[in-house]
């Protein structure tokens, strides 16, 4: 009997994190949340969920799959009653891809129902989980997010806010949360502000979202970013801000600008698209090469390639065409089929590549498998030279703050020098933007090792938040990413 399993046709990029969306006080809350999640689909494709509240009762639907599949049934949408809603798109960084891990999670407390969606990773979740189990907690999922609910249940404070604050003071890691309770919606960012969260307004309604592109799709006006370490409460009287977690050095994830965020979003008052163009221009200044055409690896490489071409004077061309309708493919995953998998997503445009010296621009190299196939594809299309330029520094370290990265030993840049990597992928030359060049593109003079303005741990190994579970040699990989020898 033939068993078919899904494989990812693009397994050589860092995987997106999760998406958050919430709206308070709108008659079409569920429908608008679906639209917001559509705009944020790039941040998580494994599962999607929505929880609504009509003031007293909560309604929920969660399922594995894309937003369009999960919420396609009009009859289902009519069951999601209420004027407030929160939604979540999931790409798992902790816990299996099963329905019980799909967010927003929902629990009943003595004060009423409470739903929560999480983007990020709690780096002491396994330690806390073990402590809570010893105290009698019964966990229903394998995601780190559930830890917050049990900490709230154990909290001594009486109000919802008291319990949330007491719970979050015990967790470590990178997180943005959007929560829904009776009569209120809550947004929180961790003290280092690693993961994004923005606040918007639609008429008399307030909106929370991971990115501004989700505000745009529903016509909401951007108000501001939720600040690092800030907790906002949205209720019938408006938006209230508190800062209960003390101060910490802000370290927003720089990879949001390189790859994760949608290019039409603005994060921390910066245009993502313009940041990528500037990165490409800086890359051209640092690593120019004689060539006939600059070609992006679509879609993530396009803005950087435009910036590279403009700075270098080498013409830009769409030498690789992407098929946007292919992702995980359910066919027999033989080696031959896997080798063809990249062609399901990318195909060389031989009409503009033949006889050309080509500069390929991509955002990153993780394992090197996709880069190898794309270089080969471009050569087969008739390119006489292939030079690879990467709009991020070499990824030498794993991320423990909400990005699904391979263990360190599987990262190509951890194992090889740049020259060895060029040989591995079959390129005539390979260059990455320097870490100082990346910071220059972001408006800084250089990276200040004593006080970096971003989290760049995947490049530098400088982790701004404790890796408690990893450091204690955690041995249950299904519960946490905090150890590097997981299967």
Range-by-range predicted roles:
Residues 168, 183-184, 201, 219-225, ...:
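PRPP-dependent phosphoribosyltransferase catalytic core
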Residues 179, 189, 210, 236, ...:
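Active-site proximal loops enriched in glycine and acidic residues that flank catalytic Cys/His/Asp
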